[in-house]
């Protein structure tokens, strides 16, 4: 990654995204950026390259018929092979929502958590809700102020006399 420095940022929006699972449980998902770094590198478009640390959060609200006796010990592994699992279909409820962060250098980072898979385990959380394992990814978009762009110098190529 080269050299990188932490950069201050302001969280403008960090929404919970709601999903309805096929078993009638409601899943809430949220991504939080905890630190942003600006590197000394630039992408092919001349934009500074940023990196960040983030944490995903998931919580559920299950109907009574899905609840069970809390597992002892409480489930902690996120490895599906540690449990008997059932894939659960799901769909997002409401409109697409992006997290929005304004960096001190006026760059705007937009990032969206996207749930890509859900499995229900044979275990129950401390509140009696089924224990789910959620797979997810993040989509990002950056809007960099023009004054931060690095001018690209065209690479010289050997001149060929194509008009002979």
List each model region and its residues.
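Short, charged/polar N-terminal "headpieces" of proteins
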Residues: 1-22
């Amino acid at each position: 990654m080269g050299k990188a420095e932490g950069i201050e940022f302001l969280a403008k929006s960090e929404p919970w995204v709601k999903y309805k699972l096929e078993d009638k449980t409601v899943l809430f998902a949220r991504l939080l950026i905890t630190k942003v770094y600006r590197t000394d590198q630039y992408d092919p478009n001349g934009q500074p390259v940023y990196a960040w640390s983030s944490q995903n959060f998931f919580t559920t609200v299950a109907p009574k018929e899905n609840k069970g006796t809390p597992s002892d010990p409480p489930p902690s592994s996120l490895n599906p092979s540690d449990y008997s699992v059932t894939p659960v279909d799901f769909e997002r409820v409401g409109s697409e929502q992006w997290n929005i962060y304004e960096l001190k250098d006026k760059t705007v980072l937009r990032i969206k958590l996207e749930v890509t898979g859900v499995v229900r385990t044979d275990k129950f959380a401390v509140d009696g809700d089924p224990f789910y394992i959620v797979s997810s990814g993040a989509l990002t978009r950056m809007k960099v102020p023009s004054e931060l762009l690095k001018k690209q110098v065209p690479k010289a190529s050997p001149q060929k006399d194509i008009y002979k």
